[in-house]
């Protein structure tokens, strides 16, 4: 707002705030035509909310009126003069007197000047110190020296990080340069194929039988060729790709983290490329099916010693059907970092960014949202607010590692459980 109109109010009787507001709108309506209708001006954000403060002195009412204005200086003066024409509030005579019209821009400019002076003093206080610069450079060099060193793993002497043996999940990349890049940013569970070779090294195949595998390739034609070569030969759980036209070795730490957060199940990537992925061990497939089924069922209630139920009384399985249109929408969400919220009839309520999802749910009325489908990570924080707001189903890209409590009233699944 540019200006603030401040006025003094005197009424020969006791009135309430709503009486004053009603008189302002009622007695100025059509006084100067539609261009100066207070209601229209507020709808267009030309006038702000009218604030009224009142106090009583005997049978009289005394107070102040504040009207923020985004109009021009002349138009603001006309509005102020129009307020002074109000001579009655409720059944009582009244008088409104304009005390001042403050230019809020001047106040902001004064704050800017004051803050600029403070910042200038701050800049002078922090003159560069050559000794401090030398110390920081030495610290940076020492930090670089502490980066994990590349090792040669297995009989094929494959370039790898020192954590590839102990890690539960490994990242498979193309070559030595890719390994060095990931090591630089703290990823020690990385191993290279040893270049664009036709046959996948046996060492990596053996690791894949014991660990989860993320295949991380370049975002170009070469990366696609590696996918077509590797996926049919060995078990791969997820596929991550560098941004389009970029190579893994050229990525920054943030770009690597983003690419890994957007990884897709290998089965989906194989279908997109029109190839057949290597089959996973039977026991792992069964485990995934059991986990997916478990997410669609409520956990059994705790058993109490004094009121134990007969073993044949098992909690019923809660079944729900996800419409085909919702499944198609979920597929299209991949890579968008967006979310869709639905009501109980699976009607779309809203579409928003994933970063806005938590606040959106927290501000919603309990029971309004039935299901959430989003291209992001299902976290404990999200499950807690969903449980509080009565959200029944959450479908995300993947589940976070720190889920310590599963709310009984929220079912959550991942994209890989559905397609």
From Swiss-Prot:
Record-listed Mg(2+) 1 binding positions: 174, 218
The protein's name: DNA primase DnaG
Residue ranges of the region described as Disordered: 280-317
Cofactor: Mg(2+)
GO MF terms, alphabetically ordered: DNA-directed RNA polymerase activity; metal ion binding; poly(A) binding
Function recorded in the entry: RNA polymerase that catalyzes the synthesis of short RNA molecules used as primers for DNA polymerase during DNA replication. Also part of the exosome, which is a complex involved in RNA degradation. Acts as a poly(A)-binding protein that enhances the interaction between heteromeric, adenine-rich transcripts and the exosome.
Keywords: DNA replication, DNA-directed RNA polymerase, Exosome, Magnesium, Metal-binding, Nucleotidyltransferase, Primosome, Transcription, Transferase
Assembly with partners or alone: Forms a ternary complex with MCM helicase and DNA. Component of the archaeal exosome complex.
Ranges of residues in domain Toprim: 168-244
Family matches, as InterPro entries: DnaG_primase, Primase_DnaG_arc, TOPRIM_DnaG/twinkle, TOPRIM_dom
């Amino acid at each position: 707002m540019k200006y603030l109109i401040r006025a003094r109010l005197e009424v020969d009787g006791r009135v309430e705030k709503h009486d004053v507001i009603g008189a302002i709108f009622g007695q100025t309506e059509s006084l100067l035509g539609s261009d100066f209708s207070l209601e229209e001006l507020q709808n267009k954000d030309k006038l702000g909310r009218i604030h009224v403060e009142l106090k009583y002195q005997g049978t009289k009412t005394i107070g102040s009126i504040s009207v923020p204005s985004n109009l021009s200086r002349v138009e603001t003066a006309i509005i102020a003069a129009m307020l002074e024409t109000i001579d009655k509030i409720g059944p009582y005579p009244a008088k409104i007197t304009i005390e001042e019209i403050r230019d809020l821009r001047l106040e902001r400019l004064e704050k800017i000047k004051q803050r600029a002076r403070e910042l200038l003093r701050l800049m002078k206080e922090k003159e560069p110190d050559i000794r401090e610069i030398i110390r920081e450079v030495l610290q940076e060099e020492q930090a670089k020296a502490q980066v994990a060193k590349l090792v040669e793993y297995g009989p094929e002497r494959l370039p790898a990080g020192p954590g590839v043996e102990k890690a539960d999940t490994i990242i498979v990349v193309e070559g030595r340069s890719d390994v060095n890049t990931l090591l630089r940013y703290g990823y020690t569970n990385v191993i290279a194929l040893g270049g664009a070779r036709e046959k996948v090294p046996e060492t990596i195949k053996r690791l894949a039988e014991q660990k989860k595998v993320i295949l991380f390739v370049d975002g170009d034609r070469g990366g696609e060729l590696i996918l077509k070569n590797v996926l049919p030969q060995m078990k791969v759980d997820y596929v991550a790709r560098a941004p389009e036209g970029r190579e893994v070795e050229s990525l920054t730490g943030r770009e690597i983290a983003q690419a890994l957060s957007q990884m897709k199940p290998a089965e989906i990537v194989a279908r997109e490329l029109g190839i057949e992925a290597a089959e996973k061990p039977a026991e792992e497939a069964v485990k995934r099916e059991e986990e997916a089924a478990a997410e669609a069922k409520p956990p059994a209630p705790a058993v109490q010693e004094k009121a134990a139920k007969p073993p044949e009384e098992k909690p019923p399985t809660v079944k729900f059907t996800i419409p085909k249109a919702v499944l198609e929408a979920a597929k299209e969400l991949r890579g968008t970092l967006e979310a869709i919220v639905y009501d109980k009839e699976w009607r779309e309520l809203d579409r928003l960014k994933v970063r806005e999802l938590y606040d959106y749910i927290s501000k919603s009325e309990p029971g309004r949202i039935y299901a959430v489908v989003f291209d992001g990570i299902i976290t404990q924080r999200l499950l807690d607010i969903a449980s509080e707001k009565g959200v029944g189903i959450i479908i995300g890209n993947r589940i976070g590692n720190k889920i310590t409590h599963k709310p009984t009233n929220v079912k959550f699944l991942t994209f890989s459980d559905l397609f």
